[in-house]
Amino acid sequence: MTSETSPDLAAALAAGTLVLDGGLSNQLETAGHDLGDALWSARLLAERPEAVTEAHLAYFTAGADVVITASYQATFEGFARRGIGRERAAALIASSVDLARDAVRRARARGVARPLWVAASAGPYGAMLADGSEYRGRYGLTAGELERFHRPRLEVLAAARPDVLALETVPDADEARAPSVVLLRGVAAGSFVGAESFVP
């Protein structure tokens, strides 16, 4: 999943240090957007997509090499609670990558010449619950249930062609295995995957 304008991310990481953005939600809140919502920054994919692009662009122009998309809490289940159907939800999830790519193009237009990358964020099951349980895990779900939760969103994100899939705040080994199984079964064949875990 390599960008048309940047070298392979895995090779770049092997060669040295890259600067990750300072947190999409931080920039959005600094710009005055209220993220006190079960969808968190994903709400803006539907309501204020331009704000998401502007936040990514601010990080690129400030020196970030990699930005993380607004898809951490973008799930089919979360959107369904807002009355958003699966087709529209899939489009919104995919748009998180498109908005970040637009920020890459705008950064280029402003003279940013260094390599830039887009990391598609996928939060844990607890992020969809929006009750803080992404820091604890222990959802009482089987590995198969967790795999079925992660698969549809990972399929959409992979199809949107980010440079990396970022599995964020995975709270325990059981959940970490679920997206790994999905990816190993070819959902994102050829992709580079980054993972961040938090074990209490």
Give names to the regions the model predicted.
Residues 1-200:
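Domain-level signal for soluble alpha/beta catalytic cores
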